[in-house]
Amino acid sequence: MIEVGDYKVKEGLYYTKDHEWVQVLDDGTVLVGISDYAQKELGDLAYVELPEVGTEVNKGDVLCELESVKAVSEVYAPVSGEIVEVNEELEDSPEVLNEDPYEHWIAKIKPSNLDEELKELMDAEAYAKYLESL
């Protein structure tokens, strides 16, 4: 784990400038979640509007919405592909994203262009440097 001020950055993941993370699984699918920075900026999460399984998303599309006590925020798809699973635990317990944003994912995507799109994401070290610039 890399620490940048009050924020933690988990190594072994890829990150976007919008503070989503991507974990590539052995079967070629990816898990998508939000970073520690994102959950702290949002504050206490009250509701997660999960995407529909089977939906095709393009990189940059809205993946879901998170409602916190402060605001409603959109989470963007960091890669293109088909949503094959959502974390239904978040429907009843959205606060788990605040408690441990790296253990709790939002959606699993079967990517359609992973090799190219991963090149556009940051590794943990690059993301930590990005956070330092904010």
Question: What do these predicted regions represent?
Answer:
Residues 1-59, 99-115, 120-134:
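Acidic, low-complexity mobile loops and tails
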Residues 66-102:
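Mid-chain, well-packed structural core segment of small domains
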